[in-house]
Amino acid sequence: MKRPSGRAPHQLRPIRITRNYTRHAEGSVLVEFGDTRVICTVSAEAGVPRFLKGQGKGWLTAEYGMLPRATGERMAREASRGRQGGRTLEIQRLIGRSLRAALDMSKLGENTLYVDCDVIQADGGTRTASITGAMVALVDALAVLKKRGALKGDPLKQMVAAVSVGIYQGEPILDLDYPEDSDAETDLNVVMTDAGGFIEVQGTAEGEPFQPEELNAMLALATQGIRELFELQRAVLAD
């Protein structure tokens, strides 16, 4: 089996995370997984949703979108259609769930963090790139809030990262780009903590059902890839 990109089955795409990419947000990055590029910002506002008022806890929510020409053909903006699509809603909920798992909300105070992930170029794996990049922006945003004296303690419990895996031409592969994702027999999105726990495993068989041994092989491959992503996050944050 030869991957269209020429990568080995266990090989990630070239990945880069550029911090402080925009001027105004408390945390911001440009994350690049090969030709997939996403701007992730984290903005902090005082106050929480009504269901949390008076509890002394914070909240984090996420939004996700794609530029009209992030893909091969121009897409109409969802705002011009008057509603968000099901895929968009699913992805932004996934991003929010994943990043909330990184935090102790009781130490965030009554603050809300808004995570915005905007895909400027898509070549597969936009949701996993968004989670991995937004995690770095989140750490930077928390540092800003700490300097402002807005936190009750350190809300960061653990780091979070995500990657895609799949079965392509009968073999498990890591970090699918668009051509691979389009032709994969199975694709899986995996979100993990740096303690080794799973936050989310989303899997779909496009043709034949995948077998337990294939699932285990994909999870092992994802775990290895996410370990590499944690190393990259730590290196970027240490810079």
Curated annotation (Swiss-Prot):
Phosphate binds at residues 87, 125-127. It holds the Pfam family RNase_PH_C. Keywords: Nucleotidyltransferase, RNA-binding, rRNA processing, Transferase, tRNA processing, tRNA-binding. The keyword Nucleotidyltransferase applies. Coiled coil: none annotated. It comes from the Bacteria. Disulfide bonds: none annotated. One of its GO terms (biological process) is rRNA catabolic process. GO terms for molecular function: 3'-5'-RNA exonuclease activity; tRNA binding; tRNA nucleotidyltransferase activity. It catalyses: tRNA(n+1) + phosphate = tRNA(n) + a ribonucleoside 5'-diphosphate. Belongs to the RNase PH family. Phosphorolytic 3'-5' exoribonuclease that plays an important role in tRNA 3'-end maturation. Removes nucleotide residues following the 3'-CCA terminus of tRNAs; can also add nucleotides to the ends of RNA molecules by using nucleoside diphosphates as substrates, but this may not be physiologically important. Probably plays a role in initiation of 16S rRNA degradation (leading to ribosome degradation) during starvation. NCBIfam families: RNasePH. Homohexameric ring arranged as a trimer of dimers. PANTHER family: EXOSOME COMPLEX COMPONENT, EXOSOME COMPLEX COMPONENT RRP41. This is Ribonuclease PH.
